[in-house]
């Protein structure tokens, strides 16, 4: 096979996956603080295991938030409301252990308090944004359909159409590429938690007909292999089956491994943390580059020093698909996008009243629709064309 002929796989996880339970709790707590005080500094981490949730982190805010009650509401919304699952919204022990943000960090991210006048980055680090024109959402096909499968699966569960479904689930999609373009789905894997009183054959048939074939177009399902609950059963799941932690699904949250990742997680962090906000800006830039037709594929790297506003570097890679040089593209990006923490927050309205970061905490942060996902706008295409 040439470099343009290959097979690529990405995975996603459902809202009831233990790590995603933690992401949603952390982001729901973040939302509650920002709703009361947009200047809140939040770094909220969650751990979940058998009927136990531990919330920890650094939070400085004028807001007063009942983190335990928020956690229970999230767990209940997801569907963990039966003690026999080993994790129940009403019976779980929920403890919170938070303290104020370090003053050494605070002075660097608060305008006028650090060595530099402007609001600086909340930490050093590198962040990537990516876009590709192989789906209408400008996302790689493997991660796009992986997300859609677990999202549809959750809908089947919440609507009670498939009564045997329980909250924990994972998906994996393998796509075959010819000449760099996706031509078929080679393999689909779905593992879903279920009640004890259902036969494996029923699960397999139901998921192929009611989930896979409803999500993935028939023209892509050519000689496709299906692996449905391939261990034979999946009764013990959620935080009772595996302990969960915030920030442990960073590849699921982004591009499924198709684009690079700087290593920083998103959930539970307010927008002063460039791990989150600069990754959103990177996606915004890359998507506008591809949507403008200046490249078929684009990856943007932004890098920051703690306490410093301007990025220390901006790098672009169009993988040989660019219509203009990458040097020229960097110039146009710097001219048309605000890359300081404050500029990113203002451009993407990351502190806008009513924003719900919890919406980002399952089914990926990118390729999504809705008012929360402001980094998905393609309103810079004309400016980028010059």
Swiss-Prot record:
GO terms for molecular function: ATP binding; magnesium ion binding; methionine adenosyltransferase activity. K(+) binds at residue 45. It is an enzyme of class 2 (transferase). ATP binds at residues 17, 168-170, 242, 248-249, 265, 269. InterPro entries: ADOMET_SYNTHASE_CS, S-AdoMet_synt_C, S-AdoMet_synt_central, S-AdoMet_synt_N, S-AdoMet_synthetase, S-AdoMet_synthetase_sfam. CDD domains: S-AdoMet_synt (cd18079). Its EC number is 2.5.1.6. It comes from the Bacteria. Catalyzes the formation of S-adenosylmethionine (AdoMet) from methionine and ATP. The overall synthetic reaction is composed of two sequential steps, AdoMet formation and the subsequent tripolyphosphate hydrolysis which occurs prior to release of AdoMet from the enzyme. This is S-adenosylmethionine synthase. It comes from Leptospira borgpetersenii serovar Hardjo-bovis (strain JB197).
């Amino acid at each position: 096979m040439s470099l343009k002929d290959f097979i690529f796989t990405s995975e996603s996880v459902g809202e009831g996956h233990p790590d995603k339970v933690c992401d949603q709790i952390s982001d729901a707590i973040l939302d509650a603080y920002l709703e009361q005080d947009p200047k809140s500094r939040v770094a909220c981490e969650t751990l979940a295991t058998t009927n136990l949730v531990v919330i920890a982190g650094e939070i400085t805010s004028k807001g007063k938030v009942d983190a335990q009650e928020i956690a229970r509401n999230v767990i209940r919304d997801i569907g963990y409301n039966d003690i026999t699952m080993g994790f129940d919204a009403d019976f779980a022990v929920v403890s919170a252990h938070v303290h104020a943000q370090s003053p050494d960090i605070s002075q660097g991210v608060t305008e006028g308090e650090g060595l530099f006048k402007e609001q600086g980055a909340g930490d050093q680090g590198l962040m990537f944004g990516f876009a590709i024109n192989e789906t209408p959402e400008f996302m790689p096909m493997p991660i796009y359909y992986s997300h859609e499968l677990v999202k549809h699966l959750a809908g089947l569960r919440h609507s009670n159409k498939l009564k045997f479904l329980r909250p924990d689930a994972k998906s994996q999609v393998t796509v075959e590429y010819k000449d760099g373009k996706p031509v078929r789905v080679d393999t689909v894997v779905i593992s879903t938690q279920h009640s004890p009183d259902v036969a494996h054959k029923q699960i397999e048939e139901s998921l192929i007909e009611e989930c896979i074939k409803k999500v993935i177009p028939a023209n892509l399902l050519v000689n496709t292999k299906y692996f449905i609950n391939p261990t034979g059963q999946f009764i013990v799941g959620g935080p009772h089956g595996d302990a969960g932690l915030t920030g442990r699904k960073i590849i699921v949250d982004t591009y499924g491994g198709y684009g690079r990742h700087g290593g920083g997680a998103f959930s539970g962090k307010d927008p002063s943390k460039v791990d989150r906000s600069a990754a959103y800006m990177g996606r915004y830039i890359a998507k506008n580059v591809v949507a403008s037709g200046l490249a078929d594929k684009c990856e943007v790297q932004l890098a920051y020093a703690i306490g410093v506003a301007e990025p220390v570097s901006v790098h672009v890679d169009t993988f040989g698909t660019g219509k203009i040089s990458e040097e020229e593209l960097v110039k146009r990006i710097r001219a048309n996008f605000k890359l300081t923490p404050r500029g990113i927050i203002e451009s993407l309205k990351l502190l806008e009243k009513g924003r719900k970061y919890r919406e980002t905490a399952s089914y990926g942060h990118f390729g999504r629709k809705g008012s929360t996902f402001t980094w998905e706008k393609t309103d810079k295409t004309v400016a980028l064309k010059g």
